[in-house]
Amino acid sequence: YTRVSEEHQAVREAVGLFDVAHMGTLEVVGPNAADFLDAATVNYVRWLEDGESQYSALLDPEGQILDDMIVYRRAWDCYFVVVNASNFDKDWAWLNAVNENRVTIDADRPWVEVTQPVTLRNLKDPASGPHQRVDLALQGPHALHVLLDCEMDAELRAALRRLPRTSFVEGQIVGADGDLVDLLISRTGYTGESIGYELYVHPDRAVTLWRTLLSAGKAYGILACGLAARDSLRIEAGLPLYEHELDGPLGISQTEAGFGAYVKYHKPFFVGRAPYKAYNDHTERQLVRFAVDERGARALRGGEHGEPVVNHRGNVIGTVTSCALVGDHQVGMALVDARYTDPGTGLFIYPEARRIAVKAPDAFEVGDRVALPVPATVLSRFPIR
């Protein structure tokens, strides 16, 4: 919408509004909904009360991550689930296959299956009618002020004022067109901001909600923000993205990504539990955040990354997974040998290793380009905000 740096700064200092309607949304309904999700996901769904949510993930029977997600408990028998857009078809097919006992969910005990199926609803499908939901994200220090400047009843206003992180409330606001907009408002987000909300709305009312929030946010310096700013914000915050810091070409697990606390081994069973635990009990890889030492330059370029990381002796110890320009310096994440994860540890990254032909030193000729390592420093895994 504007410059990525301006949108990034708006979220950190004021408020930004994101169109994330591409995210996948579904519902798990029925008296056995909690049992089903506890078997299918890594977190402990039964800990949730009405109006609470949790970060979680789907694993396959080999313990490989299929996707990460947020699970919201709307009622004891109704759970709202948000997944990555690029994985929705895969997730939907997998959950239906598990629900219908068309796949083996435990290689060591092939007889294990779902005994009490649930109802699965695709909330992106027009066939879901009034149940359809898409996501708009309102993030930044003034996000609550923007919401409270919208017209709503006293009950919803009071609920929003006291809403703790990861909880949600359902209600209505008056849209810019004068009609009511039904919402599920959760205090969640993927920008690293402590004040941030995701608003789930019927797609027919999404444009009205967008205009309503932009109008209410003018006094607070609101900016409409694109996905590039969302990416730079989550990188700065150290939040993993599927295919970059989760699974992907490096096969990164939640534990390696620093999100192992969301994997509840005390559950006697969830799909992939045994192989996941066996691998992660012995992994020697860990995700780190880093900052490039040089200021004012894009030392690392391109969106795919994969640049090799070496230690002070020149030994390859890892790979860059993401990087973004934040202010006047670059920050990123890399999967490295776990011995090099302490904050302050020096790293060296070869930014052009894949773009420059590699020769043996004795074959160098005048005019050849040689990739030089870029110094970087390990940061704390997650920033303190």
Describe the predicted segments one by one.
Residues 75-77, 82-385:
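Conserved, structured C-terminal
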Residues 1-55, 64:
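Acidic, proline/glycine-enriched N-terminal capping motif
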Residues 4-13, 58-68, 176-186, 316-319:
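Short amphipathic beta-strand starts and helix->beta connectors
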Residues 19, 68, 198:
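Acidic active-site catalytic centers that drive phospho-/nucleotidyl reactions
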Residues 50-60, 158-165:
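Acidic/glycine-enriched edge-of-secondary-structure segments
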Residues 4, 10-11, 19-21, 51, ...:
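Preference for short coil/turn "hinge" residues that link or interrupt alpha-helices
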